[in-house]
Each structure stands twice: as C-alpha cells, then as structure tokens.
Amino acid sequence: MAVQTPRQRLANAKFNKNNEKYRKYGKKKEGKTEKTAPVISKTWLGILLFLLVGGGVLQLISYIL
C-alpha cells in the first residue's frame, strides 16, 4: 500500500466516519418488513370456497326435496 500524506489520511478518516455513521454495514433496515405471499391466491381460495359451500347447499336442497 502506498504511503499517505497527512491530508489524505484526514480525508480518508472523514470519509470513513461518514460511511460508518450513515451506511451501517451489515445491518438490516428496521423500517421495512418483508411481506410473505400467501400460499394460495385469493382467487383460488374463492373458487374452492364456492365449490365447497355450493356443494353443501345442493346436498341440503336434494335432501329436503
């Protein structure tokens, strides 16, 4: 590594101080939380619910008549 002048040393120290202050190496951002996607989409959930409830209603109607 090359020898640094005192002016370079001061500039590097200032730069490093600002980087450590604002970048926070390796730390996660606390403001954001990751959203997990649902296992099944709302559309498929609606279709499945329609089939189950509709089938039950048809069974009740056929039982009554």
UniProtKB/Swiss-Prot annotation:
<comment type="function">
    <text>Interacts with target proteins during their translocation into the lumen of the endoplasmic reticulum. Protects unfolded target proteins against degradation during ER stress. May facilitate glycosylation of target proteins after termination of ER stress.</text>
</comment>
<dbReference type="Pfam" id="PF06624">
    <property type="entry name" value="RAMP4"/>
</dbReference>
<dbReference type="InterPro" id="IPR010580">
    <property type="entry name" value="ER_stress-assoc"/>
</dbReference>
<feature type="transmembrane region" description="Helical">
    <location>
        <begin position="45"/>
        <end position="65"/>
    </location>
</feature>
<keyword id="KW-0472">Membrane</keyword>
<dbReference type="GO" id="GO:0030968">
    <property type="term" value="P:endoplasmic reticulum unfolded protein response"/>
</dbReference>
<keyword id="KW-0834">Unfolded protein response</keyword>
<keyword id="KW-0256">Endoplasmic reticulum</keyword>
<keyword id="KW-0812">Transmembrane</keyword>
<dbReference type="GO" id="GO:0005789">
    <property type="term" value="C:endoplasmic reticulum membrane"/>
</dbReference>
<dbReference type="GO" id="GO:0009306">
    <property type="term" value="P:protein secretion"/>
</dbReference>
<comment type="similarity">
    <text>Belongs to the RAMP4 family.</text>
</comment>
<keyword id="KW-1133">Transmembrane helix</keyword>
<protein>
    <recommendedName>
        <fullName>Protein YSY6</fullName>
    </recommendedName>
</protein>
<dbReference type="GO" id="GO:0005783">
    <property type="term" value="C:endoplasmic reticulum"/>
</dbReference>
